[in-house]
Design a protein with these regions (language model features):
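Insoluble glucan recognition modules
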Residues: 1-136
Length: 136
């Protein structure tokens, strides 16, 4: 069956949820985006699992389509057993973490990390992250 297209009513940020049980989705305006949509010069990952430890952030690459989506891949995404957090502008006044490996976010906790080479995605609007193990 072809479900057809869904319409985005206006430019902005949205949350998209899909229920795999009943095959229905919801698309809602992300109201907090306007209030917290600060633009950061840099976002990095830091912690005992990163190349720079807790002393230096490993810079993520900003997305070409959104100033709030960041990524990391390749040799700089080789992480070791330990913990990590994301932070803005190489400072601690704005930082994000989570309590779960691989995905989560929006808390101040340290993210548990297992040794692997990863592809990492991070969203600075809500602090969500996705860390995909990518052993080569």
């Amino acid at each position: 069956n072809n479900a057809g297209e869904f319409t985005i009513p206006a430019d902005g940020y949205y949350t998209f949820q899909f229920n795999t049980t009943d095959l229905k989705y919801t698309l809602k305006v992300y109201a907090d985006a306007v209030a917290i949509a600060k633009i950061y010069t840099t976002v990095g990952i830091i912690g005992s699992s990163t190349p720079g430890g807790w002393d230096a952030s490993t810079k993520l690459t900003g997305s070409a389509f959104s100033k709030h989506v960041w990524s990391l891949a390749g040799d700089t995404a080789k992480l070791k057993d330990g913990e990590a957090k994301f932070r803005a502008n190489d400072a601690w006044d704005v930082s994000w973490g989570g309590t779960t490996a691989f995905s989560g976010g929006g808390t101040g906790d340290n993210i548990p990390v297992a040794k692997s080479k990863y592809v990492v995605y991070f969203n600075d609007l809500d602090g969500s992250y996705l860390m995909i193990p990518n052993q080569e």
